[in-house]
Design a protein with these regions (language model features):
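Catalytic nucleophile-loop/oxyanion-hole region of alpha/beta-hydrolase
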Residues: 102-104, 122-140
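Short beta-strand element of the alpha/beta-hydrolase
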Residues: 83-93
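C-terminal catalytic-base region of ester-bond hydrolases, centering on the histidine
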Residues: 242-385
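Short amphipathic alpha-helix adjacent to the substrate-entry channel of hydrolases
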Residues: 100-122
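The feature captures the conserved acid-bearing segment of alpha/beta-hydrolase catalytic domains
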Residues: 183-266
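C-terminal outer-membrane/trafficking sorting elements
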Residues: 3-5, 13, 25, 391-399, ...
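N-terminal cap/lid segment of alpha/beta-hydrolase-fold proteins
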Residues: 29-82
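Gly/Ser-rich "nucleophile elbow"/oxyanion-hole loop immediately N-terminal to the catalytic nucleophile
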Residues: 82, 139-167, 175-180
Length: 465
């Protein structure tokens, strides 16, 4: 595959954005590793459009808590003559003032992918420190919608954030989708490997309502919401993602939680870590090797899911929906025709689905870090596996407990039961009984999640022996 990429270097020809041109022809720009081939056709493949990249700048603005000159990239199809759907991407929080060329290298893969398929992609780095992350994201996206309305269709929008950027994507989408109705003709949010919720720093008291359970519930129902976290990620505590996912107010049919799993094939390791989505940056914190190689996971986890959610949100494509929101459809869980281990896909995520949690090694950014503002507005933000036994609850009983293998287990509740979920001790959902009686064919410790019509739910352990 050869793409023609025309790069524009931005100066300040009007208040926020401007450009001068220099053409560059890049061929085979992505070194590829591993035994499984890249996707070259269908969902996840690069498109046929030639691509233009512009570097833009936005001046600091203390009103928006942005103390840095924002430097970013906007990419779009060559010859675009109408406003196109846009993907806004928010990077992790390295707080390194990268040169434009180095930041471009880290973002080129996904920027080019989106634009080659006929859409617009925009991203910008954070520069000096954490005081500017959310404010600068708010500022540059606002300026982009205002100054490039001839190119960017603010009614068709996706937000994708990685690590710290995942928290910004959660906050900014909730803010802009509600306050400005961005994405009203098709919208999605994809937080990856990330922080729970990053909003205003200085103005947090006036923004706190967005971070409450009811604030998260205000996400518009038509938003498509994908959350991805990674099996061996020792940076992001999965509880932060699970908490946000559980309270994010879109129907189950429009949201999905993924646990991305790695694999080893012919001695090549496909790492599923905090850095799975990177095709350039080096991981020097968790392993002694470069684990961010450009390989098949960048397509089956990365471009294929992104392609599918764009086509679902912006073109109402039913086949694409099965790939990104398939509720466990084989199109969603099968990678590379079964050659590569697929993800866990669930609406009821749990920490023990992650090897990083089961290993007991802890996290660089545990749920209890001071900047996880959710823990200040809800007591359940950093829940643990210290579950009570089912017998500790007064408003329902389960009997017999312990039960024998294949013995009928009955739930008797004072309140109408809406849903019953049963997990094994690894945190995997093993059944969803449709009536208040069921059997289990293996001994072990199990978790019962019982949800009532009143909106409350209880989790507790019981034994089959």
């Amino acid at each position: 595959m050869t793409l023609q990429l025309l790069c524009k270097k931005v100066l300040m020809s009007f208040p926020a954005l401007g450009a001068f041109l220099f053409p560059v022809l890049l061929s085979g720009q992505y070194a590829f590793d591993g035994p499984i081939s890249a996707i070259t056709s269908g969902y996840g493949s690069f498109g046929n459009d030639s691509v233009i990249h512009e570097f833009f700048t936005v001046n600091p603005d203390s009103l928006y808590e942005c103390d840095d000159t924002v430097r970013g990239i906007i990419s779009y199809p060559y010859g675009a003559n109408a406003a196109l759907p846009v993907l806004l991407s928010f990077p992790g929080g390295s707080y390194v003032d990268f040169s434009d060329s180095n930041y471009f290298k880290s973002q080129e893969f996904y920027q080019s992918f989106v634009a080659s398929n006929g859409y617009v992609a925009a991203t910008a780095q954070y520069n000096s420190g954490p005081g500017s992350d959310e404010g600068c994201a708010y500022l540059w996206t606002t300026e982009l919608m205002k100054n490039r309305s001839n190119l960017v269709d603010s009614t068709r929008m996706g937000m994708r954030g990685y690590s710290l950027g995942a928290g910004i994507a959660n906050w900014l989408s909730l803010t802009m989708f509600n306050d400005r109705n961005w994405g009203s003709n098709g919208r999605f949010v994809w937080p990856d490997a990330g922080a729970s919720f990053i909003g205003w720093h200085d103005d947090w008291p006036n923004d706190i309502y967005r971070q409450t359970d009811s604030g998260l519930a205000a996400m518009p129902d038509d938003v498509l919401y994908l959350m991805t976290m990674h099996d061996l990620d020792n940076t992001a505590d999965p509880r932060t993602g699970i908490d946000i996912y559980n309270f994010m107010g879109v129907p189950d049919s429009n949201k999905e939680f993924y646990v991305i799993k790695g694999d080893t094939i012919n001695n090549y390791i496909y790492w599923a870590t905090h850095f799975t989505q990177s095709t350039y940056a080096r991981d020097s914190t968790q392993f002694t090797t470069f684990i961010t190689k450009h390989d098949a996971l960048d397509y089956w986890f990365g471009t294929r899911m992104l392609h599918a959610v764009m086509e679902t949100a912006w073109n109402n494509d039913p086949l694409a929906r099965r790939i990104c929101l398939g509720n466990g459809d084989s199109l969603q869980t099968t990678y590379a025709n079964g050659q590569l281990r697929g993800p866990i896909v669930t609406d009821t995520p749990w920490m023990t689905m992650f090897e990083s949690w089961n290993s007991g090694g802890g996290y660089m950014n545990p749920c209890e870090v001071t900047w996880n503002m959710r823990q200040y507005v809800t007591a359940d933000a950093c829940f643990t596996l210290n579950l009570p036994e089912v017998d500790d609850y007064d408003d329902f009983t389960i009997y017999p407990n312990p039960a024998a293998v294949d013995q009928k287990i009955t739930i008797d509740a004072d309140i109408e039961v809406e849903r019953i979920l049963v997990y094994n001790e690894l945190g995997r959902l093993i059944m969803e009984p449709k009536i208040e009686a069921f059997t289990i064919d293996r001994p072990g410790l199990y978790v019962l999640d019982i949800q009532f019509e009143t909106g409350t739910n209880h989790r507790g352990t019981f034994i089959v022996q």
